[in-house]
């Protein structure tokens, strides 16, 4: 064993001072001194449990002792009689065995492969023991879940990721998916439960037993987000539901995740074999699957963006050439050829890597370099985490931990360790780039005229610029030169560094060559230099634009087309990553896929890190907004589709925000107990206005109200018990907070909740019964108008159906035509007096006479006036489809409805384009005269004439 280095010998004296008397220095072996000096986790553990150190000294850890874990744990659990005792024994057992593993790892008593096997088997042993104990307890309490034939149904657990692959790291989350075979009911209990209820309750208890921190710590952090539908999906699914999901909706990333899935415990039982056979066709295609290559290229880009986003320069997992890239290389071959080559279907990385080499898919040299790098990186990762039992892959910056790692990795000092690390990661990165390179060969850098370089470096006199700027007017030439000079002055005020300056000197001649070829060169350059000023100290982004000429061209064209986009990119340069792939830049996410895309995006963020969750939500929204705007500018999205995309995006954000707020509130207070015997959360979010009407614009706020169906006597079931209705009030407040909190990426949305009953004076969240009563007995006509454009944008089916019924009932009430006409007209006149005619010789597209609001009032009036006779008018909440319904139900002539629809979409289209130009929503008075005249005539017909 290598002696401790000088810094560690000095630190040993600090350790000695902490040790209790029974662990006196003279009684400790050299091995014990080394491990206690290296790991604070081991040190703290043996101080609390001195008998563990005695055991370690007398029974040194062995490579095959994982075979005894189950028996040792069974003995520890033999006298456990309740859940609290189970939680305590599981935590103590995990800590005791982790100390033994840390001891063996620090002293290199066993191979790194053995360490990974022991860590994974320990986790599996603890998970299975907890499951089996709880299954028996739940069966005693609720009866045994059975299928239609009366056969007992088990809970099967899929271990995902490194747990499934038998490669768990020292301090790790565990990713699980729960499933049961067949539907049925419990037998032998006090009352019958269906299997879904039984396994959901049991699953919740299992997560609590493993995950909940106590005075003894926790067993593992449990992550269930890889299950179908993520956090919004059922906690446990039947085999049939799993099969339907993966056949109909399984995404590429879920295929990648399922490669490593392994059934915990009895993996050879009948049900285990059935589940495995069901999943195999989804993961491994029977044909050679080259369709996956583009997805893998996209994932490569995601990795690179993740590294840039989080500044992961010292991260041995996610950094360039890190563990993630080795895993990715291996998965490439598994997913492309695994259906044809059974040897590639292993869950574990090293056997699969050997199979790849045997099939000559990689050279022997590359495969060996990857194997050696993987074992080096995994040992370094596990040693790093075992210092404090901390989930980290970032290299330390302090001298003590650097000295610890250098010693344990068998290097003389830190520089020698980092030198070897760099060599390994360079090898990995080379193979990674060769394997997942772009399908187009990189073109040679275009030769640039020396004049563009001179223009950037201020080596040209004004007269000399004529040849390169000949197509520009004299004023524009002067403006371009002034912009370049001002930009250089701004650079002098900033600390860029030699590398940043070098990249900028390479980038700017290309940029000027492309920009100055345009007729609008001066305007475009002014927008781009404003953006560059914000990123010149962040060399990564300059390199992105310098190395990817296509990204630079997209930047120029988008900034030329829209100052709004230029401003967004300047405020949030992370969005520059979106310029790399034109396939996604100009092709927004499918309208029904925003929720799934967001769920995948959030998987990268720790669930308990609220700050990162808030940032991720905002970053996702901004990236999607950029794609929608780019497609709008390119003309690939008509105005109706722009609003559809903006609305679906907002609904995905609402879904995620409610989910986060719910998790936080339930962790604090538990759930309202009226939910124990029903599905859903008893909560709904109703969208009004532009959100309700599928008509959001780029900068629209969200008009929301919150509903619940909680009984008066309900309480929460957590340790901090509160009134159920108080829970929903705090939930709504939390949702508002998550939307409005300003982070470095701004706010998510402005939210206006004043359309709730009694407005700002009313409760933030309203019971469904109170909402119905208010609408029937207290609401004004304008509130019924607002209800025309209202719909549930988040909520369980029960509450959604209730709201829809109330809305339909209110809208179909018989109304006296003249009275309604007067009330609607007078409300519009008040609004026009307050909001319209504010700009002399200008037409406010929304607020002035003949504008958008007049069309909205016409449709609302006609729905309220005629829905009693034609209930089908209540079906839709958007103006365009309401106009269709009015024509279909013979209330409005088809020609008039089509003309109003054209006027409405034309005016909305102009508002979108004004927003892209960062211009206010008014135009010269002589614009849209035909549309305005048409709207005035319709207004006169319906709301003035008797």
From Swiss-Prot:
Region ranges (Adenylyl removase): 1-440
Protein name (Swiss-Prot/TrEMBL): Bifunctional glutamine synthetase adenylyltransferase/adenylyl-removing enzyme
Names of required cofactors: Mg(2+)
Pfam families: GlnD_UR_UTase, GlnE
SUPFAM superfamilies, A to Z: Nucleotidyltransferase (SSF81301), Nucleotidyltransferase substrate binding subunit/domain (SSF81593)
Cellular component per GO, a single term: cytosol
Reaction catalysis annotation: [glutamine synthetase]-O(4)-(5'-adenylyl)-L-tyrosine + phosphate = [glutamine synthetase]-L-tyrosine + ADP; [glutamine synthetase]-L-tyrosine + ATP = [glutamine synthetase]-O(4)-(5'-adenylyl)-L-tyrosine + diphosphate
Source organism, top-level taxon: Bacteria
GO MF annotation: an example: [glutamate-ammonia-ligase] adenylyltransferase activity
Top-level taxonomy: Bacteria, Pseudomonadati, Pseudomonadota, Gammaproteobacteria, Enterobacterales
Region (Adenylyl transferase): 449-946
Purpose: Involved in the regulation of glutamine synthetase GlnA, a key enzyme in the process to assimilate ammonia. When cellular nitrogen levels are high, the C-terminal adenylyl transferase (AT) inactivates GlnA by covalent transfer of an adenylyl group from ATP to specific tyrosine residue of GlnA, thus reducing its activity. Conversely, when nitrogen levels are low, the N-terminal adenylyl removase (AR) activates GlnA by removing the adenylyl group by phosphorolysis, increasing its activity.
Family designation: Belongs to the GlnE family.
NCBIfam families reported for this sequence: PRK11072.1
Top-rank EC class of the record's enzyme: transferase
EC number(s) stated in the UniProt entry for this protein: 2.7.7.89, 2.7.7.42
Keywords from the UniProt entry: ATP-binding, Magnesium, Multifunctional enzyme, Nucleotide-binding, Nucleotidyltransferase, Transferase
GO biological process, one term: regulation of glutamine family amino acid metabolic process
PANTHER family hit by this protein: BIFUNCTIONAL GLUTAMINE SYNTHETASE ADENYLYLTRANSFERASE_ADENYLYL-REMOVING ENZYME, GLUTAMINE SYNTHETASE ADENYLYLTRANSFERASE
